[in-house]
Amino acid sequence: MRQGYSPSYPLRDERITEDRLRFANLVRRQVYILLGLGLLSLTAMAVGALATWNVADPSFSHATDNPVTNALGYPGAVFSDLAMQFFGLASVPALLPLAVWSLLLMIRGYIGRIARRSLAWVGAALLFAAIASCLAVPQSWPMPIGLGGVFGDMLLRIPGFFLGGFPQGAIASAIALVLAFPALWFCFFASGIIGRGAEAVNPAMLSANRSADDEFADEDADNEAGGGFHFIGALTHLVLMTTATIRRMTGLGRRRSREDDFDDMRMVRRSAETRNAPRREPGFGAPAADDEPPFDMDDMDDGAPLAGQEWHDAPPPRARKARVEQAAPSPKPGPRAQREAQPSFLKDNGIFEMPSLHFLAEPKLVQRDPALSKDALEQNARLLEGVLEDFGVRGEIINVKPGPVVTLYELEPAPGIKSSRVIGLADDIARSMSAIAARVAVIPGRNAIGIELPNPKREMVYLREMLASRDFEQSKAKLALALGKTINGEPVIADIAKMPHVLVAGTTGSGKSVAINTMILSLLYRMTPQECRLIMIDPKMLELSVYDGIPHLLTPVVTDPKKAVVALKWTVREMEDRYRKMSKVGVRNIDGFNQRVGLAQKKGEPIARTVQTGFDRNTGEAIYETEELDLEPMPYIVVIIDEMADLMMVAGKDIEGAVQRLAQMARAAGIHVIMATQRPSVDVITGTIKANFPTRISFQVTSKIDSRTILGEQGAEQLLGQGDMLFMAGGGRIQRVHGPFVGDDEVERIVQHLKLQGVPEYLDAITEDEDDDEGGSGPAGTGNLEDSDDPYDQAVAVVLRDKKASTSYIQRRLGIGYNRAASIIERMEDEGIVGPANHAGKREILVPTGDDDF
């Protein structure tokens, strides 16, 4: 093992980011100062209106032609009249929190716990009104109510109910004294003078450099919420804050002494020397700087001057390849998130309104785990190398990539070390590193093996962060799906139009249902009902039923397994019909078809084609006619099957046949399938399904066998659950992704919004089980005859039409079992429709096959 290694990190990007944060903080502070000045101006105007209040001025409660004497004119007269009517003399102290809030905005740049302080403000105003009503009303009071206004008199009726009358005299004074303490506490709490010890720090100030303006906020943060007893100290502190602000704004400050200047210069020089000095790395062979022996006077030699001693740095350690990469920053917000951050009051009527990002939970600001610091990750890398050496695996960690859930350690094994040997040590590595699980896999295209260890503290990935990212907004994918984040924290956006189908598997509680919801919401946030339609099949009747009624659905959520078979067969017929339309237009996929139809509609010209209708009897030349095609743009269709295992148990053969045809041919027709199951066994995920679903997602499974069934290799059993997945794209490359979380309440809000945009246009033919007149072409092209009451009549029709009667032929044509087909043939023989089998196994049809139906 190499010692004394320290990775070098680029500082240019950090300096640029720091400058941007400083500039953003400067602009933000100026905005807050303007807001504070505006609020202070409004407070001063309110005080002026109350100071010049005259009961004879015209207002809402007093209609008169007298001239307005209020200093603020008619608006001031109306405001002062309403304030005195409702709060009385309590209107004046009720303005104190507004004045303090304006100062806080100018000084600190934010007001913490604004909701609680607003409630405290209302409570203080009401209590002050009650206290004012306790005072005796003088003869000069022009109002017919008490000094506390309407609210004050109403509050005093509560103790009056128990006392038998309105409080007066000593009782009123006692009530005023009792209410004084909570009124003052509410007033000081609402003003922000007390109760700042536990309030949240403004997130915008965390990343900015500390300035002189922030010193007051830091000093105030030392106060506790229980400081309500020290009113005098709080008032003194407010006066000092105001004085310091005025001095700083006017440029008047105390003169600094020479010693203070000297100390500041010394600190600046020391910090500059520390920043520019080369970093010294501790080595295992030399004591670290913190392990130096204590100073001893006996070790000093008076004969040798201290200044003459020369200190030499330790020899530079040997360079290593290992380095700790910075975690990927949060996804940059896209144009849509920026537009929704500034709400508009103008809405377009008659246009489908896409769901807003505000329906989703906002990501919480979390501090970076100290266990993911560069030093801690470097130490874990050295420890992991030691663990591998204990098991006889030589190599070195060349890269460390921390992420929101796991950290990837890239191991470059020594020559002669087999990858299978390292992969087999996954459980031992997890035990030695005290981890819940460890996943070991070869990194494609590199001479490295990835070792993924879970972080001590897991970060949650939010769907709003994914949908608001610039990667999702500017993605060129036709049907973009926000799958989650990689190990590095980079967003993963997949296009189901290129997959073209996806198989999802995972046990209960692994996050499979949440992933299905995120896929659906990804489509709903980008596609209108004219662009994408959905067919949802949910045999469990719980997961997808919440989407029932949205305009994107082609049919209500199918919960009956028998109806699910019919819906899949309708999808197959729709696929074949789309291919016939595209063949007539002469295009190869749905995008070309929609482009051709849209261009024709824009020009106002019908789509026509030339077809041959026959030959001229005289000349023998071909006759051509022009056929006009009445076509409309076709939307994408996404079929979502939440539980495949239940469908396979009810009608496995029909389901497998329909899914096979869709998976093989439906891509160009714009039909895509998302199939999920929680039982990834070979009888559910058959070889036919696996061959036609190259894109697969595996969540946590219980065994290595299930992992091999889904992905073809182990590793899914080592996942952490709760959205932790392995994403295998079409090329077979497996990528670990952490899926985003979306709650049920968020889904309900989005569904309610979509229901307000319009009603769905259902197609009844999707779930109608109509008999196939042609007998079908196999399990995917016929009705579910095995579930019919009597398929005997259909079998007779097939025999009379095709003039073939055998057990295997009936079995193939009707898609039924061999035993049932044999019973039908025996019944036909008993009724005289067919004869007995000859030596070759063929039967003669005894019933005449004329024009008359049987």
Curated annotation (Swiss-Prot):
GO cellular component terms, semicolon-separated: plasma membrane
Binding site for ATP: G509, S510, G511, K512, S513, V514
Amino acid composition bias (Basic and acidic residues), ranges on this chain: 264-282
Keywords, comma-separated and alphabetical: ATP-binding, Cell cycle, Cell division, Cell inner membrane, Cell membrane, Chromosome partition, DNA-binding, Membrane, Nucleotide-binding, Transmembrane, Transmembrane helix
InterPro entries the UniProt entry points to: AAA+_ATPase, FtsK/SpoIIIE/SftA, FtsK_4TM, FtsK_alpha, FtsK_dom, Ftsk_gamma, P-loop_NTPase, WH-like_DNA-bd_sf
Iron recorded as keyword: no
Topology with respect to the bilayer: Multi-pass membrane protein
FtsK domain residues: 489-708
Pfam families for the chain: FtsK_4TM, FtsK_alpha, FtsK_gamma, FtsK_SpoIIIE
GO molecular function: ATP binding; ATP hydrolysis activity; DNA binding
Subcellular location(s) of the protein: Cell inner membrane
CDD domains: TrwB_TraG_TraD_VirD4
Segments of this protein annotated with the region Disordered: 252-341, 768-790
Comp. bias (Acidic residues): 289-302
Bilayer-crossing regions: 31-51, 87-107, 118-138, 145-165, 174-194, 226-246
Stretches in topological domain Cytoplasmic: 247-854
GO biological process assignments: cell division; chromosome segregation
Family: Belongs to the FtsK/SpoIIIE/SftA family.
Biological function: Essential cell division protein that coordinates cell division and chromosome segregation. The N-terminus is involved in assembly of the cell-division machinery. The C-terminus functions as a DNA motor that moves dsDNA in an ATP-dependent manner towards the dif recombination site, which is located within the replication terminus region. Translocation stops specifically at Xer-dif sites, where FtsK interacts with the Xer recombinase, allowing activation of chromosome unlinking by recombination. FtsK orienting polar sequences (KOPS) guide the direction of DNA translocation.
UniProt free text on domains: Consists of an N-terminal domain, which is sufficient for the localization to the septal ring and is required for cell division, followed by a linker domain, and a C-terminal domain, which forms the translocation motor involved in chromosome segregation. The C-terminal domain can be further subdivided into alpha, beta and gamma subdomains. The alpha and beta subdomains multimerise to produce a hexameric ring, contain the nucleotide binding motif and form the DNA pump.
Subunit structure comment from the entry: Homohexamer. Forms a ring that surrounds DNA.
Full protein name: DNA translocase FtsK
Organism: Brucella suis biovar 1 (strain 1330)
